[in-house]
Design a protein with these regions (language model features):
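Long, contiguous bundles of hydrophobic transmembrane helices that form the permeation core
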Residues: 6-9, 31, 38, 176, ...
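Alpha-helical transmembrane segments of multi-pass membrane proteins
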Residues: 94-107, 132-152, 174-177, 183, ...
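Membrane-core helix-loop-helix motifs of multi-pass transport proteins
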Residues: 127-214, 221-225, 365-366, 375, ...
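Membrane-embedded alpha-helical segments and adjacent helix-loop junctions characteristic
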Residues: 42-130, 271-358
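Structural signature of hydrophobic alpha-helical transmembrane segments
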Residues: 1-6, 57-65, 115-118, 180-183, ...
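Transmembrane alpha-helix interface/packing and boundary motifs in multi-pass membrane proteins
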Residues: 13-21, 70, 104-113, 144-151, ...
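Structural signal for alpha-helical transmembrane segments and their membrane-water exit/capping regions
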Residues: 2-4, 12-44, 66-77, 198, ...
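Hydrophobic alpha-helical transmembrane segments
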Residues: 3-8, 26-29, 60, 95-102, ...
Length: 431
């Protein structure tokens, strides 16, 4: 009963959002609440919602200060020189621009933090996309796939870290076998970018494209950027922030809070101007925070009501007796839908240990289950429980339903390619 209700809840949510019957905010809250009432758990709704909010509150606060920090950096034109270098290198060719988006997305995803990655990529490329009329959903799709592939696979990215800790694995033993499939999947993303770039180039008016190329060649396309001491300070502060973030010197929230305060004092001295900056950037941050908190309601109800566990058990029951050798492959495929709908905590701490225990009965090492589980991160980055996704959607000014209509076909394709690469390289096995 709970499994059926859980799948029905997820299907209803997708239908309501993609058909635009409800906004993402209302759908992500109302569907699990209705399901909990139907399941007879209405009396426990308050506790389930609070448990869910407890898990996402730190993330919501982190996103607030990350948006404030990078919003300030954008107003200070920190990334403008990078944009100009990219534009000159691309020579105004949409194919090169879109492929460059994929390459930069893959590189910045190495820092492991989705919000940071999205804001850097959007800062560099979104002005170019808007100038040429390239669909910003192309940027969002590539950035999400890159983050899921790199940050979702690396031991320091957060998702795999959960699997390594809960299954008591060696990070080296887990990761060394994932480097090959991760690299091949990155190439697959670049191939998708090339195809999307060709498609976007065919949509752009030839005269408009030719005029833009002339502007680039003459230098008219660029605004002069004054590289004063504040520009160099901002660059050094941002670089230091990235280093401390990767080194895990302190919690991300603490790092962004301190960095924002320092940047605010250096770049804007007048108290009134500081307050105006916070008001402007808060307008971008607050909608993101609201959606993250709503996702916490979704996660709390789905997890504490037992629907997630029932769905996982139902999926496991599909594997016939004697087919234990295919559990790693089954885990990789199951990771795609579960990763899409579930929070990383719920998936890695709730589902993966059950799969690993089942695999152990057939002599399959837990490392393979962790690797298989990480493959679902590409679709996780496109799902409603991915907090950084709401930042990305805010930056490109897109609705969740529109994004998923565009992105899911490519996300599913690349995810299955990831499964195939993992099998070919021996990261997971079926023998």
């Amino acid at each position: 009963m709970l499994a059926v209700l859980g799948f029905a809840t997820l299907g209803s949510f997708m239908l309501l959002v993609m058909r635009k019957y409800l906004s993402a905010f209302t759908a992500i809250m109302l569907t699990p609440i209705a399901a909990a009432v139907i399941a007879g758990k209405g009396a426990k709704l308050g506790d389930m919602i609070m448990n869910g909010l407890d898990t996402v509150a730190p993330t919501a606060a982190l996103l607030l200060f990350a948006v404030l920090y990078f919003g300030l950096m954008m107003e200070c034109k920190l990334f403008e020189p990078i944009v100009q270098v990219i534009v000159r290198a691309s020579k105004g060719d949409p194919v090169r621009i879109v492929v460059g988006t994929a390459v930069l997305s893959l590189l910045v995803a190495l820092d492991g933090d989705g919000t940071t990655s999205y804001m850097i990529v959007c800062s560099a490329f979104l002005p170019i996309y808007r100038r040429l009329g390239i669909n910003p959903l192309v940027l969002a799709t590539l950035a999400a796939m890159a983050l899921g592939t790199i940050s979702g696979t690396t031991p320091w990215g957060g998702a795999a870290t959960r699997g390594i800790s809960v299954l008591h694995l060696s990070a080296t033993e887990y990761f060394v076998h994932m480097i090959g499939p991760m690299a091949l999947t990155s190439l697959a993303i670049i191939a998708v970018a090339y195809w999307l770039g060709l498609r976007e180039r065919s949509k752009i008016d030839a005269e408009k494209l030719a005029a833009y190329k002339l502007e680039i060649a003459s230098g008219e396309a660029f605004e002069p950027v004054k590289a004063d001491w504040r520009m160099w300070f901002n660059a050094a502060l941002t670089l230091l922030l990235m280093v401390l973030l990767i080194a895990e010197v302190a919690d991300l929230l603490v790092l962004f809070m301190v960095a924002f305060v320092i940047a605010l004092l250096v770049n804007i001295r007048a108290i009134g101007d500081q307050q105006d900056l916070i008001k402007r950037q808060a307008a971008n941050a607050v909608p993101v925070m609201i959606l993250v908190l709503a996702a916490g309601v979704f996660t709390g109800i789905m997890t504490d009501s037992g629907m997630i566990e029932a769905m996982a058990d139902a999926a496991l029951s599909i594997v016939p007796e004697g087919w234990g050798n295919v559990i790693p492959l089954f885990t990789a495929i199951l990771a795609l839908p579960l990763g899409f709908f579930m929070s990383n905590d719920g998936y890695w701490f709730g589902v993966v240990p059950v799969l690993a225990e089942s695999a152990a009965h057939y002599g399959i090492p837990a490392n393979e289950i962790a690797r298989a589980g990480a493959i679902g991160q590409i679709l996780h980055m496109m799902g409603p429980t991915s907090a950084p996704l709401w930042v990305l959607l805010g930056l490109v000014k897109a609705e969740l339903g529109d994004f998923q209509k565009h992105a899911l076909r490519w996300g599913v394709l690349v995810s299955f390619a990831y499964v195939a690469f993992a099998l070919l390289t021996g990261a997971i096995s079926i023998t």
